[in-house]
Amino acid sequence: GEKAIECFRQMQEGGLSPDPVTFICILKACASVRSLEMGEQICLEINKQGLLEENLMLGNALVDMYIKCGLPGKAQEVFEQLLVKNVVTWNGLITGYVRHGLVNEALECYGRMRSENVAPDVVTYTCILKACGIIGSLEIGEPVAAEVQKQGLFRKDIMLGNTLVDMYAKCGALKKACEVFEQLPVR
């Protein structure tokens, strides 16, 4: 991370203009070393060049950088600026909210994602089930768990399977937790 940031600085000092791929790489480096200051400079440059609206991967990298630097509110701002969002974009925000203990925001974001007809994936389901376990909400978790079970996803992904068992256990549905546990291919 630090080496990439130093290389980027040298590139700028040499008068070379970064392209979107360079920005994505440096944002990942900023996220990995939690360099908010450099990340904010990059964000300003991206906005100055008007690159955010047309590059989804750049938007995803910015959301990720702000989440990893501890600023979910800034990640939300970037998210709202994006004209196009995919499951990775939504997952970045949902994962970040859960990571920072903002469970209600994660669930609200998931609801918006579903209302915009974006299909959840294993990452989405894992985060939402974790959120439901944190707040002990079987009412919200059960329909999500039903989708996961219907698709057989919990048998294909060990993390999702464990999170499903954990959610049921934290919600007090120990019998259901044991049933799911018994169906896991790897224990």
Question: Residue ranges of each PLM-predicted region?
Answer:
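Pentatricopeptide repeat
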Residues: 4, 19-24, 39, 54-55, ...
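Long hydrophobic segments that form regular secondary structure
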Residues: 70-85, 165-187
